């Protein structure tokens, strides 16, 4: 409290940013948009106290799931503001750009779901794949697990090692299933296994799909290339090109 943000992140020391203060002392009249990047369960507390004219953009899981019972099931936390769930929107910008105006709460997707839904949502909408048999092998750097990762692993156990974790029970399964089911309008089956690999950051998701009819790999590639051509942050590699993080 009272220090500049640059004290913790030297990379932004030249930026003019306010000093860190307690949320109780914030003058809400000077704020239009509020970002929260806090542990699960904290953003919903803030959502209850901020004025309704402030847009909350949350990076946690507090408003990702439409059903508070599912949130309790997957995250083990009773939701403190169930009514605000209905006023929130789960938003991957590439798919919900036109729905973001006049929103109260924008919920950002998880890291794995982002990498998985960017290619899958267009294909599910176009009915190009069998949604009852989607296999996802995803690998992530250890920074995605936050500070707690260092309590479970030391450098020696991370180095030259690949570990599968939360097999069949990863929390991100809930939002992947929720969003793909909305689009397909029927029950889907996703087999998702995340892995921790010895690098600091980055995600590589390899997705195995069963296509319908004459939808070859080349046809799917061409469709995704066309679909994302105006999405600035999506870069489509050349067909059959080796890719990595």
Q: What is each stretch, according to the model?
A:
Residues 1-167, 185:
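N-terminal Rossmann-like NAD(P) cofactor-binding subdomain of oxidoreductases
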Residues 115-116, 143-147, 199-203, 215-217:
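Short acidic/glycine-rich loop or secondary-structure boundary segments that cap or lie
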Residues 117-124, 173-177, 221:
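Predominant activation on well-ordered alpha-helical scaffold segments within soluble catalytic domains
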Residues 125-129, 170, 178-185, 212-213, ...:
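Generic secondary-structure signature for well-ordered alpha-helical cores
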Residues 131-135, 187-191, 233-238:
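A short coil-to-beta-strand element that immediately follows conserved catalytic motifs
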Residues 164-168, 195-197, 243-245:
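Short Gly/Pro-enriched turn/cap motifs at secondary-structure boundaries
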Residues 169-200, 204-206:
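Oxyanion-binding "anion nests"
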Residues 205-245:
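C-terminal active-site/capping subdomain that shapes the small-molecule cofactor and substrate pocket
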């Amino acid at each position: 409290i009272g220090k500049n943000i640059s004290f913790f992140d030297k990379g932004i020391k030249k930026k003019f940013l306010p000093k860190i203060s307690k949320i109780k002392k914030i003058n809400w009249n000077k704020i239009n948009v509020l970002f929260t990047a806090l542990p699960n369960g904290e953003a919903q507390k803030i959502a209850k106290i901020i004025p309704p004219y402030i847009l909350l953009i949350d990076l946690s899981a507090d408003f990702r799931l439409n059903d508070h019972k599912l949130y309790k099931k997957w995250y083990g936390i009773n939701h403190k503001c169930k009514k605000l769930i209905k006023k929130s929107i789960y938003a991957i910008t590439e798919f919900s750009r036109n729905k973001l105006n006049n929103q109260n709460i924008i919920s950002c997707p998880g890291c794995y779901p982002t990498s998985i839904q960017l290619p899958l949502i267009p294909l599910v909408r176009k009915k190009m794949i069998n949604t009852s048999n989607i296999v996802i092998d995803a690998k992530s750097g250890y920074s995605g697990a936050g500070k707690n990762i260092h309590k479970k692993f030391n450098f020696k156990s991370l180095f030259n090692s690949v570990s599968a974790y939360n097999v069949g029970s990863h929390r991100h399964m809930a939002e992947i299933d929720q969003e793909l089911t909305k689009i397909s309008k029927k029950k889907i089956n996703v087999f998702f296994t995340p892995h921790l690999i010895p690098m600091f950051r980055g995600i590589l998701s390899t997705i195995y799909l069963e296509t319908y009819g004459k939808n070859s790999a080349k046809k799917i590639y061409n469709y995704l290339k066309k679909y994302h051509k105006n999405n600035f942050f999506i870069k489509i590699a050349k067909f059959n090109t080796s890719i990595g993080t």
